[in-house]
Amino acid sequence: HVSGACALAVSYYYGAEKRKGLTGEMLRQALLSSTQSVDRYCTGKYQQYLGNMGIGSLDTYKLLRNIAKIDGIPAQRVGVGDTVSIDLSNHFTATNVLGYTVSVPDLVKIELRGGVMKLTGLKKGRTTIIVSDGAAIRKPIEVTVE
């Protein structure tokens, strides 16, 4: 089942839009973010398996939705004192559990609300923001503050 879903995802990625550049890591991230937990079924005589059933069962529809948005987030340029907004719903299938880390936090002020990330330049320099979906997908945003 998983190998067939992978083949379908690769075909879908390269399909009608003729995109290029799908890497093994991108496919792995999409797969790991496309599962449903099976812990809720571990009740009664199966309670001993609670927490021991791996990451869960693969949701192929969710995989195709994830693979459609697996491409990276474009680099951003922002002036000192200026603000740019990035609608992360264009890059992630679910935006309710997004988190981020910043390589140089004192260069940019970040506000994440409702799937929109606002970046305000604080001082000149370059930093990388890694946005995560709470599962396996991690996308970098290269930010230059001018």
What role is predicted for each listed range?
Residues 1-51:
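Hydrolase catalytic cores
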Residues 60-69:
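Secreted peptidase-domain scaffold signal
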Residues 68-146:
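Extracytoplasmic soluble-region selector
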Residues 29, 33, 62, 90:
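Charged/polar, solvent-exposed surface patches and flexible loops
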Residues 3-7, 62, 125:
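Short, solvent-exposed alpha-helical surface patches in non-cytosolic proteins
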